[in-house]
Amino acid sequence: MTTMLSIVQVKNNEIPKTLSIKKFKLIAGVDESGCGSLVGSVIAAAVILHSIQPISGLADSKTLNKNKRLNLYKNIIKNALAWSIGYADVTEIDRSNILEARLLAMKRAVHNLSVKPDLILIDGNRSPGFTEIPYQCFNKGDARIAIISAASIIAKVTRDQDMIILDKQYPKYGFAQNKGYPTFFHLKQLALYGPISQHRKSFAPVKHVISDINRKL
């Protein structure tokens, strides 16, 4: 199998007994990218891999260099049985919070799959609450379970590409390099030029800049 675990002990009630991965044929891994960014959507990916065509080298996307990650991304989208993306945009993030937006993006990613999985493995300790499909959450699942690693790679590469496009529209903030995360340069430019429409106004660094601007009016 493509998963790194063959047996998973379930602690919650989603699946009442010890979860034997082998009895499920269509296993989807789900992960997200962009929770800590100050800019843009949070993006989730859902991936179903062929059990007889394992992809070697899968790992947490954050631990891979750019070239390795991109090569794996191409391999996954070429050879996966199914894969999809789900977005939660800036308005949805600011309206609720990043944790709820993360779950919403995950739910959309699974919904967008062209093939319905019979098991979902999710990175983290919270689930959107799938009612028709058994699921299980795993802390650091992107580093422990290959199918979740695959989802983490799809989500990160997709979001990085979106940030490169945004950088071309707003080159002052360095989005192509920092991907919207609060680097020194990004925060400096944010304070100097103010936020754009894609900045998450509910996030403290952006909220602080907006407050400073309003005080000066």
From Swiss-Prot:
Subcellular location: Cytoplasm
EC number: 3.1.26.4
GO MF, one example: manganese ion binding
Catalyzed chemical reaction(s): Endonucleolytic cleavage to 5'-phosphomonoester
Textual note on the cofactor: Manganese or magnesium. Binds 1 divalent metal ion per monomer in the absence of substrate. May bind a second metal ion after substrate binding.
Main function: Endonuclease that specifically degrades the RNA of RNA-DNA hybrids.
Name the record gives this protein: Ribonuclease HII
Species per Swiss-Prot/TrEMBL record: Blochmanniella pennsylvanica (strain BPEN)
Phylogenetic classification of the source organism: Bacteria, Pseudomonadati, Pseudomonadota, Gammaproteobacteria, Enterobacterales
Gene: rnhB
